[in-house]
A protein has these predicted regions:
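Pre-Walker A (pre-P-loop) alpha-helix and adjacent loop at the N terminus of AAA/AAA+ ATPase modules
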Residues: 22-63
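Conserved alpha-helical scaffold flanking the Walker A/P-loop in AAA+ ATPase domains
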Residues: 47-50, 103-123
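Walker A/P-loop
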Residues: 52-89
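Conserved beta-strand position immediately N-terminal to the Walker
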Residues: 58, 122, 160
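Canonical AAA+ ATPase core
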Residues: 104-109, 130, 134, 142-219, ...
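Walker B catalytic acidic pair
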Residues: 125-126, 137
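Conserved AAA+ ATPase small/helical "lid" subdomain
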Residues: 214-269
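C-terminal engagement/docking regions of AAA+ P-loop ATPases
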Residues: 253-333
């Protein structure tokens, strides 16, 4: 892991006896494997893995061409997940996502043709370019882990993870996702442009005659299910729960925000804090675990107040949230 880019204490060797060391090693090896093809995004890799371990879905908001699809493909390979990708354009129908019935001439009956979400990892590319009906079809799959077609409900494979991308608001042909759908994503991340050094490394790798490094499978879907179970068992004290509640409460009373963090956001922050603790080799959560994830988990769930008729930028919204968090005293643990 590159010095200066990863969060401190991630993947330390000081494992708690209660945590299965094999699972932590699998996560570390998976992160290292993904870094073969995704250069300079160590924190993003860690947080995507954490979200998968917490049972959540990921929203990557960024301009085209910064490696979102490369990240998703590498992630699916390292975790041995069945992977489907769909480009969400204006003509994509809900049935393309969920599936539909088609006539079988041999039997005279209708057979179900599964949609693109019948996989372990579904990359919903440019989700904010499609219709609200198609977005709603994906919403059910994300929320229920199942889809309903003609009154018949079908379970999706376990694990099921949505990694959606969207272009920044204001891009041509895009529309803002409704708050109800944004709230279903456990975390929103931005990969951002690479540094000059990182882009130089990417250019050299792409120009080389050598074959691109292969991302090898490190863990299985069953390993991920075990990791999720282990993460759920991480201990959270009453003081930490109170800290998360006070953080979210502070967002609801701040005049700079029209809408604060929902209870769903608080639950997501608690789940992600458990995974942060597990990644650091602890079987209990400390305040630093909460602060490590809170902004990424909650920034897309708040609505800022207008300033002189204009909405603050995303970076300004994140700074408002960070400022609110700094004003909440963490417990001494």
């Amino acid at each position: 892991m590159r010095r200066g880019t990863a969060s401190p204490h991630i993947f330390t060797e000081d494992f708690c006896m209660e945590i299965d060391k094999r699972l932590i090693v699998l996560l570390k090896r998976s992160a290292d494997e993904i870094k073969k093809t995704v250069i300079g995004k160590d924190d993003i890799i860690i947080k995507i893995l954490m979200t998968a371990c917490a049972g959540g879905h990921i929203l990557l908001e960024d301009i085209p061409g910064v490696g979102k699809t490369t990240m998703a493909v590498a992630f699916s390979k390292a975790l041995s997940l069945k992977y489907n990708r769909m480009q969400f354009t204006s003509d994509v129908m809900p049935a393309d996502v969920t599936g539909f019935y088609m006539p079988n001439r041999a039997t005279g009956e209708f057979d179900f043709k599964p949609g693109a979400v019948f996989c372990n990892l579904f990359l919903a590319d440019e989700i904010n370019r499609t219709s609200s009906k198609t977005q709603s079809a994906l919403l059910e799959a994300m929320e229920e882990g199942a889809v309903t077609v003609d009154s018949v409900t079908r379970k999706l494979p376990n694990p099921f993870i949505v990694l959606a991308t969207q272009n920044p608001s204001g891009s041509a042909g895009t529309q803002l996702l409704p708050e109800s759908q944004l709230d279903r994503f456990m975390i929103r991340l931005s990969m951002g442009y690479p540094t000059v050094g990182e882009e130089t490394e990417i250019l050299k790798a792409k120009s080389s005659k050598k074959a691109a490094p292969e991302v090898n499978p490190i863990m299985t879907a069953q390993d991920l299910i075990e990791i999720r179970s282990a993460a759920e068992d991480i201990f959270v004290s009453d003081e930490i729960y109170d800290y998360i509640a006070r953080l979210s409460g502070a967002t609801r009373s701040d005049r700079r925000l029209e809408l604060g963090v929902s209870t769903r956001g608080s639950l997501a922050a608690a789940a992600m804090a458990k995974c942060a603790a597990m990644f650091k080799g602890r079987n209990f959560v400390i305040p630093e675990d909460v602060t490590f994830v809170y902004t990424d988990v909650c920034a897309h769930r708040i609505i800022p107040a207008r300033v002189k008729g204009k909405l603050p930028s995303d970076s300004e919204v994140r700074e408002i949230l960070c400022d609110i968090c700094r004003g909440v005293t963490p417990p001494k643990i």
